[in-house]
């Protein structure tokens, strides 16, 4: 059986006790992907050649995971930008989650509304699905999603060639976007944290199988 390999970027944690940086990933991601019959492959942040590494892995999809703010750890920003460059050149689908969606937005010349007292941290809320194709794929035009982000993407922040497909019902900030041409999609919620909800596995299927491109 052919492995369905998904690469996952890693967050950086600075461990003061040992004076070192470590790449980390929530066990939720590994459990979630394996439950859906995907093979998770980790992409570290201190590679000498990101493109060679990804090329050797023969990945079928890539997830830019959450955690860390953009600019907090430059090595992660650089790694994920190189991942996006490689994915675009090789038509590899990409899903950006929370920080990952923000990284996608800045990659395409968008901006982030930082340090907002948004009330999004730890507070589930509804989102409106704006795109008819995605309404059809989800089977609903509204979803309840988790929320763990302070930084926001507002309508004026959205990057070039990105289409908005989901808005927060409470403040109309952007909760989902995708590229008009490339198989790249981002969500501000965390699919790995509410695995029992159907739309969490649906977003993985939509990105991996390029269902809107």
Question: Where does each model-flagged region fall?
Answer:
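His/Met- and acidic-residue-enriched segments that coordinate or traffic transition-metal cofactors
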Residues: 174
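Active-site-proximal beta-strand elements of phosphoester/diester hydrolases
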Residues: 185-189
